[in-house]
Amino acid sequence: MKLSELLKNVKTDSVYTDCEVSDITDKSNEITKACVFVCIKGNHFDGHSVAKQAEEMGAAAVIAEHDIGVENQIIVESTRDAYSRICAAFYGNPAQKLKLIGVTGTNGKTTTTFLIKNIFDKLSIKSGLIGTVKNITGDKEYTSSLTTPDSKELQRLYAEMVDSGCKYCIMEVSSQALAQGRVDGCHFDIALFTNLTQDHLDYHGTFENYARAKRKLFEICDTAVINADDEYAHVMVDSLPCKVYTFGVKTDNTDFSAKNVKCFSDSVQYELLTPDNIGRINIKIPGRFTVYNSMGAAVCAVLAGADFDSVISAVSQSKGVPGRVEVVDTDTDYTVLIDYAHSPDGLENVISSLRETTDGRIITVFGCGGDRDRTKRPKMGKIVGDLADIAVVTSDNPRSENPELIVKDVLEGMKSCKAQIKTLVNRTEAIKYAMSIAKAGDVVLLAGKGHETYQILNTGKIHYDEREVVADILKGKI
């Protein structure tokens, strides 16, 4: 491909030498002969510092935000934006051949995108999926490493979806991806807002920056679908240039609403109302938050043109998502659940929902991630301490931090809580303890890791699957 073709949608005043391009990259360890190297300044590394090295290694051109003294340099205002656009051009602008449905918010993104995918599958609408658990491009599936892939991988996945005949791409769009411009140049047919609570402040710095990043998605879409019950809904919808639809449970002043909500230990039931229709949903995923996730998914499908009654039927047939209120097969008189809840709001939602349907005690095993926002640790501790009967504080993904110090931060918020508190830094020991004290009717909630099958320690990433841990405990292997 010619360099000039890659730069068609990139604004630059630079005079450059047109040439054949073999590849594009923003990673210094992927520089090859005849590639285009894009200099991106991150939190820990500035690609501009290796621009000369890229030229010496045979890069055909270097894209930068300022003069870097190489022969074939292209200066742009934002290399992140430019990288996203040239990646799209490199793969033939595949997003233009797909209808994009993006879901953003602190909690509920994964479940909502899976539910939309399930609905489309039931209705024989071929679609791809991009998100936290896995990426699906028609007949192929890949394990995910990021909620929203980097620009190059994202465009590659789009292209694979197009090649496999997908009509839609349903994707989680993280705040980091929006802030870093990974979806710059993409236009979404439908964008859904689930909710906004404290998370990722280690990256964004302030809650205002976090909210601002989320809002970006609704500035590049045709139709916005907003959870009106969330207190920050107004931040998302204020002065939007697109058409806005709202949904909710707490008010009648929405386009779509849920009435007669009933929560059971293994399901939720409710009536979905629109100005023209009413449908009864009975979905086998427990928790009050399931009402919001499934309603948001149904609204997106209806706005995409699907028949209302068919959508209602498809939602009711949908199954749960790995690591989201996932019931572990234990054959015991108590229940073991695995859930990805790793924020204050996420923990509050899942424990509060369990309280509605649990006759026995709620025993919660949880920790907080290392090298992440420290301010949410005592908040998470307080929430679990106030809502659970027994709180077992342990490790999550400590990363480079001392796990004992992370636990200490969590305990700061649990000084006056009602729950019994046990601290066991080793997560396996914590799970074993929780299961050993569980009685008939109790729920053991393993919170934080969800679908993850690894744990990140200061020595690196190790295999760690809580389903396997639970099975081994029951077999007496641990």
What are these regions (language model features)?
Residues 1-85, 89, 223, 257-262, ...:
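N-terminal leader/targeting and accessory segments in enzymes
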Residues 1-12, 33-36, 46, 241-243, ...:
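ATP-dependent carboxylate-amine ligase
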Residues 5, 64-70, 164, 188-336, ...:
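Acidic, Mg2+-coordinating active-site environments of NTP-dependent enzymes
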Residues 7-10, 83-224, 228, 232-243, ...:
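Phosphate-binding loop of NTP-binding sites
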Residues 60-66, 224-228, 365-366, 389-397:
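Short internal beta-strands
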Residues 70-71, 136-142, 198-203, 372, ...:
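A short acidic, helix-capping loop that chelates divalent metal ions and anchors anionic groups
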